[in-house]
Amino acid sequence: MRIMVDTNVLFSALLFESVNMNIIFNEIAMNHKLVVCSYVIDELQGVTKEKFPAKIAVVEKMLSKMSYELVYTPKIIDESLFEIRDIKDYPILYTAVIEDVDILISGDNDFFDEKLEVEKPLILRPREFRDMFVL
């Protein structure tokens, strides 16, 4: 399966020691295809620069060593595909939809709002992904 992660999941995986994130990313690397969109990369770099400026080089190095499919998030997007509470999350889900990814992993509550309706991808929290796919 093609599995996309949002900014907070990638941020947690790269900057914090987490057994759960290590397990999740190992599962993806071994059995699936990790997908990262350009919007997430840009957002990750911005958040790192703002909150952890000393870690910018670490993030850059890790991103360059990771194996993933990089997909482009268009600058001009169709804003009528779905409604999401936080408009800043729209480009991430939009990219997941147009790139036909199977699963989007996010810890952001806006992706789990009951009003959000998308047929695909399946949106899971990190723990849900682990419980469903890690044996």
Q: For each predicted feature, which ranges?
A:
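Residues that mark the start of a beta-strand
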Residues: M1-R2
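PIN/NYN-family metal-dependent endoribonuclease catalytic core
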Residues: V5, L15, M21-K49
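A secondary-structure boundary/capping signal
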Residues: D6-T7, C37, G107-D108, R125
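Alpha-helix capping/helix-boundary segments
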Residues: V9-L10, V40, I92, D110-F111
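Hydrophobic/aromatic ligand-binding patch that stacks against planar heteroaromatic rings
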Residues: N26, T95, K115
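Domain-scale selection of a single, long terminal region
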Residues: D42-I76, I92
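Active-site neighborhoods of divalent-metal-dependent phosphate/nucleic-acid chemistry enzymes
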Residues: E69-L104, N109
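Acidic, PIN/NYN-like endoribonuclease modules and their adjacent C-terminal/linker elements
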Residues: N109-L135
